[in-house]
Each structure stands twice: as C-alpha cells, then as structure tokens.
Amino acid sequence: MRGSGPRGAGHRRTQGRGGGDDTPRVPASLAGCYSAPLKGPLWTCLLLCAALRTLLASPSNEVNLLDSRTVMGDLGWIAFPKNGWEEIGEVDENYAPIHTYQVCKVMEQNQNNWLLTSWISNEGASRIFIELKFTLRDCNSLPGGLGTCKETFNMYYFESDDENGRSIKENQYIKIDTIAADESFTELDLGDRVMKLNTEVRDVGPLSKKGFYLAFQDVGACIALVSVRVYYKKCPSVVRHLAIFPDTITGADSSQLLEVSGSCVNHSVTDDPPKMHCSAEGEWLVPIGKCMCKAGYEEKNGTCQAPSPVTNVKKGKIAKNSISLSWQEPDRPNGIILEYEIKYFEKDQETSYTIIKSKETSITAEGLKPASVYVFQIRARTAAGYGVFSRRFEFETTPVSVAASNDQSQIPIIAVSVTVGVILLAVMIGFLLSGSCCDCGCGRASSLCAVAHPSLIWRCGYSKAKQDPEEEKMHFHNGHIKLPGVRTYIDPHTYEDPNQAVHEFAKEIEASCITIERVIGAGEFGEVCSGRLKLPGKRELPVAIKTLKVGYTEKQRRDFLGEASIMGQFDHPNIIHLEGVVTKSKPVMIVTEYMENGSLDTFLKKNDGQFTVIQLVGMLRGIAAGMKYLSDMGYVHRDLAARNILINSNLVCKVSDFGLSRVLEDDPEAAYTTRGGKIPIRWTAPEAIAFRKFTSSSDVWSYGIVMWEVVSYGERPYWEMTNQDVIKAVEEGYRLPSPMDCPAALYQLMLDCWQKDRNSRPKFDEIVNMLDKLIRNPSSLKTLVNASSRVSTLLAEHGSLGSGAYRSVGEWLEAIKMGRYTEIFMENGYSSMDAVAQVTLEDLRRLGVTLVGHQKKIMSSLQEMKVQMVNGMVPV
C-alpha cells in the first residue's frame, strides 16, 4: 500500500491521451468556443467533448459505486471556498446532464480549493478503485503565471458509517496521492482544436466502514475534472467444470487469493466441493476438482442434461384388449438412444403398473381390459442412463362387441384348447433346451425345471442378454477381484489376450467419426495428429490422435494399444482422458482429449517469465493431484517429467505418457532403454536406478524434478552434466540448486521430495495439501531463496564450464550467446573472469540486463563456474 495516512493507496496510471492519430479533435462546429476567454465557454466546449467521448461500459469484473457520467440528477458535491471549484452544467444529445468541475486560480498565490463528494457506500468491498478523467493546462503556456501555477492536484478520502457526516476537518482526510497529468494542453492545442484527456486510477484499502467520502484539493492548477468513477473488483459468477462459482468480491490485499467453493450444477455431484481462487484483479485462478453428471445425464454447454422427454405420441390400432402406439425420437437425445421404457397402468390405479422395453419407436400393449382408459408414459435411455418420463397420454380400449357376448359358451372350450397347447409346447421346448440350460444361467437344474416352470427358460435367457447395465457387479480379471466403488489399477500385461484388455477398458470408435486435420508431432509408433471427433448425438470435440504406422508387427500393435488399456482405467481432471480407440480399421488409432498448449516443458520455455508464482503453483498442484489419483489406484508412473505433462488453454496440467516399458541395462549412461530410445536418469530416484525399485515414492522424487523444471521455466535438470556424473553426485548427497527467484517454501518441498530414504519423502496427498496451503496464503511465497543458499546445494563439477575454461570475459559471453553485453561488462569493471564470478542478479539488473531469459542464462553459467571454483560443495 502506498499513501501518507494510516491506510494507504496503491496507484496505477492507465493512460494519457495526446496528439497523434488517436487524439480526439474538437469538431469544427465548436471551433468558435476556443476564441473565448479561458473560463466559461472554452472549458465548456472542451469538457463537453471529453465527456461525450468517455461514456464507455465498465468491464464485467468491475462494479461501479459511483460514476459521475451516469448520475442523472445533482451530484450533491460541495466546493469550498465557493470561488474555487466550479461546476459546469451541460447536457448531451439525449439531454442527460454532464457533470464536470473546473478550477483555474493560477494567477493567485496560496490556493487551497476543496471539492468534497457525497457519501459513497462501499457495498461490502474492502478495496476500491478511483478512476479520474481530467484535462490540465501547461503552466509554461500561461504568461505571467509561472510563479504561482501548479500542474498537480491532491486526492483524499475519509471513512465513515455516517451518510450525512460532511462536517469533516481537512486534517481528518487521508491522502491517497498527488495526481499529475501525463499530458497537458497549451494554447497551440487550443488553436488546433486538440483535446488531451488524462486517465489516472488509484486504489484504496483495506476499508473497514460502510462507506467513505472523497475530496479533491487544488493548490493552484488550471484543471477540469471531467469524470470520477469509483468501483470495486469482483470475480464474476462463472460455471467451470460443472460447478457454479458465485460473484466474489476481491480481497483487500493486492496479492490476496480468496478460496471459493463452487456448487454443482443441477443433476451433478462430487465427493469434494470444487474450488477456485479469486485474485485481486478479479480473475478466477487455480481450479481444483470438478463435478460429474449423475447417471442418466450428460454434460452439454456447462449443464447436465437428460434425454429430452418424448413429446409426440400417436395412437395406432386400438382393440378391446390392446393398444398400439408410436412416437418420435426426442429433440435432444444427448447421445445414442439405446432403448425406450414404456410405463402404463389403468387410470386411477397408478400403483399397479407394467413396464415394456423396446428398441423401436413403437409398441403394442396387450392383455388390456375392454372399454378401459390406460395411461402411458415413455422415457429414453442412453449410455448415460434414463431420461425423464414424458407427460401422460391417455387412450381407451374398445368395448366388447355384442356378437362376442353371445358366444360366451365357446370360451371354456377355447381356454382348454389353449392350455393343452401351451403345456405341450412347454414340454417340447424343455426337451430341446435341456442340454443348454446350464449355459444360460440355470446352473445344475435338469430339463424338468423347464417342464415344471416354463418361465425359468425366459428368465434364464433374460438375465444373460438383458442384464441391467447399472446393476452393481463383481468382476474377476485374471485373478484380480474388482469390487464396486473400489478403483484399482489392473496391469494389461496380466491378460493372456491383450485385445481383451483393450476392449475391457477402451471404447471402440468408428473411424468415420474422426476427422484428422494436421500432423502435430511424431510418436514412438507413428504420427501424432490433431483433429475432430463427432459421435452421434454428441457435440464435436477437438482431439489428439496417435496413429500406428503402416507395416507394424503384431507386437508393435499390442504395445501401441497397451497405453490405451492403461489410460482407459483412469478418470481424473489432471489425467489425460482417453476418448477411445480405432482397432477395426486402419490406421489403428488412439484418440485422446486435445491439449492446446502441448507439453509443459516446451510451453514454459516459450513463455519464460510470463506467469505469476501462484499460476506456477497452480500447475504444480494439478500435477500432484493427478499423481495422487494414480498412487491411490496403485499405479506407478516411472517416467514423470515435464515433457510428459500436457497443458491446455486454461493452464490445467494433465499427466500423460503411460505406454513405455522399461528395462534397465548395463549401460555406461545408466539410462532406461525403451522401444523409442533412452530415457535419461535425471528424473529417476536413486533406488530405482540402483535396485530397479519403482514405487510411488520414486514417483515423488521425479515430481520434485518436475517442480524444479516448472519454476525454472523448462530448464534442463543438471544442465549438461553426464548421466554418470549425475548418478555420482546424487549418491554423494548433492541436489539441484534452487531456480532463480524461487520461493523458499517451494524449494524446501523439492528437497523433501529428494530425500535419499524413500520412506522420508512426502506422499502425494501431503504434497497436494502443502500446495493448497501455499495457494491459500500467497504471502508465504514471497520469501525467496537467497543466492548464497542456492549455490550451497549445487552439484559437483560441471566439467569444463568453470571460469578457467575461458580466457576472457568476451569469450565467455560469446560461448553462452550473450556477446552483446561484453562492452557493458568491460565498462563497469568486470574485465576478468574472477570479477565476473562475483556478479549477482542485482548487478545484472544494474548493468541493464533486463530480459529474464538473459538473466537466467548468465546466472546459470556463473553458478556452474562457482561450482568448479569451490571444487565441490557441501552435500545436502
């Protein structure tokens, strides 16, 4: 906070408008005004133009408490002394008043002119902003006024719960700031009919009372106050991940993040309430968690929608004992309709109803009573579940005819004949099906079960073919028991037939639903493309498509689809989502969600220094949440690195790359060999290198390296050290140094992840909790690791990168492609490598090295030189 009182005010200068193509010019019709004296018509014309050009809508995250441009009546402001500030009353083309105030006592000494606003309610906001638009005369353009003319004015505020507390003494007001103009106008500007309008914004907080007054003090300037806008900022209500986050007023501190819990949209649920964080600038940051649509509903445009009800039902043939109906598919099926459920009952007997299921849009209900009214309702079922029933439709069966009533004597004969026929038919069916009864679920029952209870045949077949998809089941997978509600990772390699694993965990997609647009990379087995996926009844989605190259072997196909078998078991917002596979046509494809920003390491390198610490922590939190999910399922990733994290346009990070098989060989580089090449050991825990012991704890070590990559914006871990040197240094206790400008809390978490004893490393759920605490308390991230402690944890020698490897400062700078700074270094006394080795980050800024990327490159090289100069540092 800035300011001279007990409460301060930050300030931000937004714009000043002056000459050039964008400069507003006074219309020719008003040119006559400018030949008038300074006071009166001249200012009136000038200010009228200014006001008309600045009636702009406020951004959606700003809520106005006062806008003098929109007040229709009297502002109620008070000026004293009365011959100081003067209100100029004009109207625009719609006859709405334009409120402007001017003062120009530049020829008189000791000016002290005050303009007081009426009481302004803060509406619960603890930090408010004041936007001023004004014009100011250049003192040099006023003959005879140089000794007394000023080019600034002062702004004050006073907090009060009293709406009528105008009796405030001058010394009770707290100064917000002295306001100066970016541009002032001269006599020449008046001749050219050019208006120069300044815009200044200041903020005040924290506020503790219900409202406040503003005051403007003139001390001898020639100024016109065109408009005053007072507002606070909020994070506007938004729906994110099927959760509604309400309007949230920002906090009092400019660095404060407010944690806000969201509520799930209708027909969606979650285990833990989703959260987002409202920044001081009115932006939603760091989304955590999401809601999921309930069974029977599907996500569409931020809502959970069920299949729309059947609305158009037509009656077909109606008889005394049956009614035939037909209907049209719902307007919004929200997916492929699998079947319809028809519920009907005799009117006024709703408790006794019958259900018919049909895959067609027509049915015939039989066995009804003559001359009776029946009520029908229909609903559709998709893969997401059932929709809502339609409204009730009533139809009446026909009465019994007279001829039929005279033939009642024939009914017993017909009934006996039908009964005998049914029994004979049941006996025949029983003998025919007795050998296959066990296959359909009757167990050891003999053929007699079919004879004695013909209905069992139907039930047996129904339970096999018509099993309710929502019924809870217990599955056995190659010796693994999968209980309802317990998600456990199942290794696809335990399946005798790998294709079974693919079909178990991945959805088959028709190739015709996929449109490939462009190639975005090359994978281990073929090209990686971006494209679109359009499934029937669903909206089109952008997707990434991995293809299997032509001429593949069966083993390559099995390995390629193995990743889909793994990925298909995961369902988490921070794990890459598998849309499905194409295996019944060529090319064989794996289809996943599309992540616009690609791999995290490349993205960070392209955007070096562009994110706040909170945004970086939000990325790390997402990765940790994804890894916690994998750890809870019993899955060990083994290859966690920034290159295997994908990031979308909302900066949400998702763990990917589940398809690599790893075999540790006797390699001089101590690398893991895979089908696609070698994975460097820089991300791998020491026990995994030495004993092939991969656990969630070894993933935690890798996560610490990912943290280092993120905070250093994609820098290569251990720089150009060889793998052998890295293994040796880590075994001896050396650890990576803190990245530049790294919060101490984050670096300490990295060191915790790099504990040699894997049992001493934090669990992923603990890491998520630690990062949540940092996000809720941003001030804890302000303490940075100092330069000396950064060097103390540096790794052992980096070969020939020390100061002795370069003969001059110029040669060193050229070697790291920073030769442009050679002359600056020499001019400031850094003429030897020994002198250069003592340079700090502050020195670089003082020398004019302002680009963050250049600072990092030079400091990294200097740190490496220091390592060689001390010839081995103290282990962690």
Curated annotation (Swiss-Prot):
The residue ranges for the Cytoplasmic side of the membrane come to 434-876
Q: Which residues are glycosylated?
A: 266, 301
How does this protein assemble?
Answer: Heterotetramer upon binding of the ligand. The heterotetramer is composed of an ephrin dimer and a receptor dimer. Oligomerization is probably required to induce biological responses. Interacts (via SAM domain) with SAMD5 (via SAM domain).
List the source organism. Mus musculus
- Name of this protein: Ephrin type-A receptor 5
Function summary: Receptor tyrosine kinase which binds promiscuously GPI-anchored ephrin-A family ligands residing on adjacent cells, leading to contact-dependent bidirectional signaling into neighboring cells. The signaling pathway downstream of the receptor is referred to as forward signaling while the signaling pathway downstream of the ephrin ligand is referred to as reverse signaling. Among GPI-anchored ephrin-A ligands, EFNA5 most probably constitutes the cognate/functional ligand for EPHA5.
Which residues span the membrane? Answer: 413-433
- The UniProt entry lists the main location of this chain as membrane
Spell out the reaction equation it catalyses.
Answer: L-tyrosyl-[protein] + ATP = O-phospho-L-tyrosyl-[protein] + ADP + H(+)
| Protein kinase domain: residues covered | 514-775
GO terms assigned for molecular function: ATP binding; ephrin receptor activity; GPI-linked ephrin receptor activity
Q: What GO terms in the biological process aspect are recorded for it?
A: axon guidance; cellular response to follicle-stimulating hormone stimulus; cellular response to forskolin; ephrin receptor signaling pathway; hippocampus development; negative regulation of cell adhesion; positive regulation of CREB transcription factor activity; regulation of actin cytoskeleton organization
The record's account of tissue expression is:
Specifically expressed in the brain. Highly expressed in hippocampus, tenia tecta, indusium griseum and piriform cortex. The highest level of expression is found in the CA3 region of the hippocampus and the pyramidal cell layer of the piriform cortex. In addition, elevated levels of expression are also found in amygdala, medial septum, nucleus of the diagonal band, and in olfactory bulb. Expressed in pancreatic islet cells (at protein level). Expressed in myogenic progenitor cells.
Q: What effect is documented for mutating residue 856 to A?
A: Strongly reduced binding affinity for SAMD5 SAM domain
Span of domain SAM: 804-868
